Amino acid sequence: MKALITGASSGIGRDMARNLSKRGYDLILVARDENRLQELKKELEIYKVNIEIIAMDLAIEENCKELHKKVKDIDFLINNAGFGDCGDFTKTDLDKEIAMIHTNIIAYHILTKLYLIDMKKVNRGKILNVASIAGFMPGPLMSTYYATKSYVVRLSESIREELRKENSKVQISILCPGPVDTNFNKVANVKFHMREANSQKVADYAIKQVQKGKFYIIPGIDVKFAKIGAKISPASIVSKITYKIQKRKLQRK
């Protein structure tokens, strides 16, 4: 079995690599930071699996296409690369937001599409798109990030229905955690009001749920309730609540 993991140098991606290597998966690990990838590869060598590292910035569209040309015949795709930013929409950095859209949306879209085509040809394979509970609600003061995760949720939901109608054995799932203790928080320049989940526990839970064939993977009771609350409440109310939460983050920096 072979898995391709993007955003593999830290956080959930790194911890999924640890989980899958213990399960005997050969791994292709992709991230921008080659040094961290080398460290992770060295760590995982004890599991006697084949590990290939690819230092690549997936915010660049051509890199995504090149990755697909280079890496073939995978059984499991984990789209995990991504980052966020926090602040008033008119004050956040435009170039950073464009890079975020390329990483969080376009890279996911390209890799999901190209590898799904491959998987459908052999009628097997798994795709896990790492989204966020943010994908189910509006997110003032993190507007671009929330919008990117909403795209991932809706894209994945739509693909799932297409696969169901075709009776395909290819599986797609979405991981939608709340705050997780990862490098994301430093990049997004925020401190969360909610208690942050342990990234290894989130990764282990996600892999376990994928193996069970689950589509929505939402770690934690409080996060599950947040999804339900966002679904049954008016968007205007959810926006007000989210604004207050994000404001606290900015004040805690």
What is the predicted function of each stretch?
Residues 9-10:
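Conserved glycine-rich cofactor-binding loop
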Residues 23-40:
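Conserved glycine-rich Rossmann-like NAD(P)H-binding loop of the short-chain dehydrogenase/reductase
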Residues 80-85:
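Conserved NAD(P)H cofactor-binding loop of Rossmann-fold oxidoreductase domains
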Residues 88-90, 96-101:
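Substrate-binding pocket helix/loop in short-chain dehydrogenase/reductase
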Residues 132:
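Residue(s) in the substrate-gating loop at a strand-loop-helix junction
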Residues 174, 191-227:
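C-terminal helical subdomain
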